Amino acid sequence: MILLDTHVVLWLKSDSARLSRKAKAAIEDARKEADGLAISGITLLELATLAKKGRIQLSISLESMLQEIEAQFIVLPISARACARTLQLPASYPEDPADRIIGASALVEGLALITADQEIRRSKVVPTIW
């Protein structure tokens, strides 16, 4: 199983060419597994917030989009372990609460994170694929 950052979910939904070859290959490999692709529960909130702010355009209702995503991926709950782990992340890791929950979730679940976020990748705190 691999964990997807929020922007990766958006890019997958839009068939974006922005995904790296390495990310595409990892996603294709993970899709072959029953427990292949996961997102954090906070990703659903991030997507809802982006829609509310008009930063993403929806062709269906927000609730329908979120339900589609929920059906497409394993949604990891925001666990107590992940919340506690956010406080142990070093200063080099992004301060954004969603980034911290996603990164901490990857760490406590032992998952690699697919992300284009340079700040996350540069921190080398979480194993990333890009």
Predicted ranges, named:
Residues 1-39, 53-67, 109, 119, ...:
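Short, well-structured N-terminal submotif of metal-dependent ribonuclease cores
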Residues 8, 43, 82, 102, ...:
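Alpha-helix capping/helix-boundary segments
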Residues 47:
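Phosphate/NTP-binding elements of NTP-utilizing enzymes
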Residues 59, 70-116:
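Active-site neighborhoods of divalent-metal-dependent phosphate/nucleic-acid chemistry enzymes
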Residues 87-89, 124, 129:
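Phosphate-binding/catalytic loops
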